[in-house]
Amino acid sequence: LSRFRESRYTHAGPPHHLPGRGALHISRETVEEACADLGGLRDTLRQHCERNNIGVCGGGTHPFHHWPERRICPGDRFNDLYQRYGYLAKQFTVFGQHVHVGCTSADEAIWLTQALGVYVPAFIALSASSPFVDGVDSFYQSARLNAVSAFPLSGQCPPLGNWQEFTEHFAFLQACGIAQGIKDLYWDVRPK
């Protein structure tokens, strides 16, 4: 892939926000605009890869990575994760898509978090694309979930009725030393 790395921006068109290695952030007003933009990016990627004899494959885990060989992404946040969770941070070589939804109020964000939480099993079924772990078929359609579920603050958001309850719960997690920031919450649906 080194030859691809050298020429990847030559044909890619206008730049997008790239917050880190392997991450792409796109902000659009409507779902239709986001779908059109992602479709165009997918087509551009496919064309560029074909010119360079590279295949494209999607998934939620790397199909044959070996976690002891993973490097921790440079930066305080990931170094802290590694110090706190050790090998879990290296096993956390997963990727996926997340969506930010704008809300008119903090209480609406909590309501939406709770309302979307009941659909998580359907989201998982629709996105099942990670059957391999360390090069072996896991017999799970979404082994990615197992990597995330190892973290203490993963899974469903606890039942919270409003933003005040969320801030009290989060303050409790901080006081216990479990969470330093909101990004420490690996909930399936998370308010921000």
Residue ranges and their predicted role:
Residues 99:
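An acidic/histidine-cluster motif and surrounding catalytic segment
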Residues 1-95:
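Terminal catalytic/cofactor-binding subdomain
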Residues 74, 104-192:
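Loop-rich catalytic cores of soluble enzymes, especially ATP-dependent carboxylate-amine ligases
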